[in-house]
Amino acid sequence: MKTLTTKAELDAFCFMAQTHPFVTIDTEFLRERTYYSKLCLLQIAVPGDRVDDAVLVDPLSPEMSLEPLYRLFRDTSVVKVFHAARQDLEIFWNDAKVFPTPLFDTQVAAMVCGFGEQVGYETLVRKIVKEQVDKSSRFTDWSRRPLTDAQQKYAIEDVTHLRGVYLFLKGELERTGREAWVVEETQSLTDPEIYDVVPLEAWRRIKTRTSSNKFLAYVRELAAFREFYAQTHNIPRNRVYKDDAMVELASTKPTTNEDLSKSRLLLREARKGEIADGIMNAITLVNAMDPEAYPKLPKTNDKLQVNPALADLLRVLLKAKSE
């Protein structure tokens, strides 16, 4: 198999790919030590059985630029096929503010076709293509070079088998007339708000047992500082402080370093320096805040707006479960 290491090589492959009705794409990345995913490898395949119809792309090569791929993403005549696309899309959006159009997610399509919710790629390959995926390289450090033959084989199979999975699911959707369901549900994956995390909105992800507006104000400001710090330093949120530590801080409301030293859950590194200052500033801000500025949870009796496409998908799932 071929690994593309220059922009010129990727440009030639993407130019060829534009003559095909679809391409299958996957990524390998690392995120354990960073806020943003680090793209380490791309796999792309077009229909066909030739060796050159599927390639690896090395984004870590100094001579590589992904602009040819993003140009392909904008070509609406070529369907871009992914499996469980959300994390892949996040990488592309953060890198270039671009989404592949049109997008086909085989995990969404498989759900509509009765394979179950969030079905894995390995399962679809086994059931549809009748092949076994080698998962021995699943926990590879994809940033290391050179990649072994086994790692390359594992990576390329994530797009070669995907071609058969896509064609089967596409046929099933056409046969049952459910293409529109997949289109609408997949379009939700290309909503920038999913990937652009606004620090002041980060509190909505935190689970707490207390719903008082003032308590939520502490959580909001602490979550906003954590999100901003993690983004600007490109470190995981939990490296700043974990959710349970945040809830503890919202309860104890520390305003001095001595107060912080009494925390049971706060990381030692967070009890001094920039993080400690950020925590105390957040608490002080809420202490002086007008109650009208506190966040408010929606009332439980507010009418829920149900996406009709989602309702249809749920009905399909229920039917599949009962058969």
Where are the regions that the model predicts?
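Accessory DNA-binding and partner-docking regions appended to nucleic-acid-acting proteins
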Residues: 149, 169-323
